[in-house]
Curated annotation (Swiss-Prot):
Keywords: ATP-binding, Chloroplast, Fatty acid biosynthesis, Fatty acid metabolism, Lipid biosynthesis, Lipid metabolism, Metal-binding, Nucleotide-binding, Plastid, Transferase, Zinc, Zinc-finger. This is Acetyl-coenzyme A carboxylase carboxyl transferase subunit beta, chloroplastic. Pfam families: Carboxyl_trans. One of its GO terms (biological process) is fatty acid biosynthetic process. Its EC number is 2.1.3.15. Acetyl-CoA carboxylase is a heterohexamer composed of biotin carboxyl carrier protein, biotin carboxylase and 2 subunits each of ACCase subunit alpha and ACCase plastid-coded subunit beta (accD). Its cofactor is Zn(2+). It catalyses: N(6)-carboxybiotinyl-L-lysyl-[protein] + acetyl-CoA = N(6)-biotinyl-L-lysyl-[protein] + malonyl-CoA. InterPro entries: AcCoA_carboxyl_beta, Acetyl_CoA_COase_Trfase_b_su, ClpP/crotonase-like_dom_sf, COA_CT_N. Residues 191-212 are annotated as: Disordered. Belongs to the AccD/PCCB family. The lineage of its organism: Eukaryota, Viridiplantae, Streptophyta, Embryophyta, Tracheophyta. Zn(2+) binds at C230, C233, C249, C252. Binds 1 zinc ion per subunit.
């Protein structure tokens, strides 16, 4: 285990504030920023390093630890995993964490620390800084420059070791204005495989209470307000920036699920969205009996949690100035299942577009027909298909279907596959019956990847696969190719009417 010495040139107060370590000079806080209040993880009265405990301010602290030292070899420190601290009594400890093996270790080998201190003094007196090809004389001239450089190194260390972005605000002594986010105890989580991490100690006089941490699922829930974990590469994406990235993983480019509100914002010009039938709600038409939760109560619960009235939002707006009618399904509302209200809203949308002669976009994300409404939900397939037939074949208008993940069941068997142009998102799960249903029904194994968009594309099931970034531009070009133009280019015609319908 390599250990690097820290120099006390750093100001305690500035170190605490700028690294977000603590609010007092007597405490050493975390390299991290989380939420909530949890049980203590470590207790050690002998070393006077008391419990690591979560606080409402988003930091945890170890009382009576005085400060980090400094670094003798700053470039070697970046890839190291051990830090040395000294408590208020002048006693030194080495703090080690192994991210890969999820180990947190504290040691107080006094002989080793004394040897290091002697080596460090010799290092400075011999002028080793001049031999370092990375050394910048100005960098070490002032305490302020040291702090800035140390901040940069801590940031680089976390980026390289934890594989996530961290953010450090320098030049401010205000604790609330400076922060650093990291995820010390977990890195790449592999799907359903759950591993438990532990905290252990070394040293003859150590008396720590070791508590095994929760599994990956619980840990990810705890940090869910800060990070979004990619379903494909399991890397973490900072939640505050994730929406601006269109829910696309910055590491691997995987398209994660997107709610209907974000999709509307992505596709529709700002200030042009006008919802339709947003007050229409389900009324439990067959009085579905459930041992767990009544259907109406379940609907109410989803309405409170999502802010939606049903699993689809319909309305009119403009896409790059072109008037359109659009329906966007939301998988967060009962899995985007299609009930009588969903079918009615989509049917009314298509009928409105037929009367106004404007193009229709349907963004599909659904698990299929809603079982709580029985055959009434299956009837919606025929009702929507009938309205679509009149719109497409009789009126010669243009319908675009966008298949997102997942699109299955009755939606796949009806309006999802009826578009004049059928667009799929990359790696979207598109099928009629899900993998589990097929395997349990036919007792056969469904090959991996046989129900993703790329496989179906090569079989000719739909037209292009379009990522979210260029989607709006692609739709705009398709509409203009089929005779629909922005209002300012088609002032002589009615709202985006077809100029060339044949």
């Amino acid at each position: 285990m390599e250990k690097w010495w820290f120099n006390s040139m750093l100001s305690n107060e500035e170190l605490e504030h700028r690294w977000g370590l603590s609010k007092s000079m007597e405490s050493l806080g975390p390299i991290g920023n989380t939420r909530g209040s949890e049980d203590p993880i470590i207790n050690d009265t002998d070393k006077n390093i008391h419990s690591y405990s979560w606080s409402d301010s988003g930091s945890y602290s170890c009382s009576n630890v005085d400060h980090f030292f400094g670094v003798s070899d700053i470039w070697s420190f970046i890839s190291d995993e051990t830090f040395l601290v000294r408590d208020s009594n002048g006693k030194g400890y080495s703090v080690y964490f192994d991210i890969e093996n999820r180990i947190f270790e504290i040691d107080n080998d006094s002989s080793f620390l004394s040897e290091l201190e002697s080596s460090f003094s010799s290092y400075l007196s011999n002028g080793s800084k001049n031999d370092n090809r990375y050394y910048d004389s100005y960098m070490y001239d002032t305490k302020y420059s040291w702090n800035n450089h140390m901040n940069s190194c801590i940031d680089s260390y976390l980026r390289s070791e934890i594989s996530i972005d961290s953010y450090i605000s320098t030049g401010s002594d205000n604790f609330s204005d400076s922060y650093i986010y990291s995820y010390i105890f977990s890195e790449k989580v592999s799907g359903s495989d759950s591993e438990s991490s532990s905290i252990r100690t070394s040293g003859n006089d150590s008396n720590f209470n070791v508590r095994e941490r929760d599994n990956d699922f619980d840990r990810n829930q705890k940090y869910g307000r800060l990070w979004v974990q990619c379903e494909n590469c399991y890397e973490l994406n900072y939640r505050s920036f994730f929406r601006s990235k269109m829910n696309i993983c910055e590491q691997c480019g995987y398209h994660l699920k997107m709610n209907s509100l974000d999709r509307i914002e992505l596709s529709i010009d700002s200030g042009t969205w006008n919802p339709m039938d947003d007050d229409m709600v389900s009324m439990d038409p067959i009085e579905f009996h459930s041992m767990e939760e009544p259907y109406r109560d379940r609907i109410d619960s989803y309405q409170r949690n999502t802010g939606l009235t049903e699993a689809v939002q319909t309305g009119i707006g403009q896409l790059n100035g072109i008037p359109i009618a659009i329906g966007v399904m939301d998988f967060q509302f009962m899995g985007g299942s299609m009930g009588s209200v969903v079918g009615e809203k989509i049917t009314r949308l298509i009928e409105y577009a037929t009367n106004e002669s404007i193009p229709v976009i349907m963004v599909c994300a659904s698990g299929g027909a809603r079982m709580q409404e029985g055959s009434l939900s299956l009837m919606q397939m025929a009702k929507i298909s009938s309205a679509s037939y009149n719109y497409q074949l009789n009126k010669k208008l243009f319908y675009v279907s966008i298949l997102t993940s997942p699109t299955t069941g009755g939606v796949t068997a009806s309006f999802g596959m009826l578009g004049d142009i059928i667009i799929a998102e990359p790696n979207a799960y598109i099928a009629f019956a899900g993998k589990r249903v097929i395997e349990q029904t036919l007792n056969k194994t469904v090959p991996d990847g046989s129900q993703v968009a790329e496989y179906s594309f090569h079989k000719g099931l739909f037209d292009p696969i379009v990522p979210r970034n260029p989607l709006k531009g692609v739709l705009s070009e398709l509409f203009q190719l089929h005779g629909f133009f922005p209002l300012n280019q088609n002032s002589s015609g009615a709202r985006g009417s077809v100029i060339c319908s044949e």
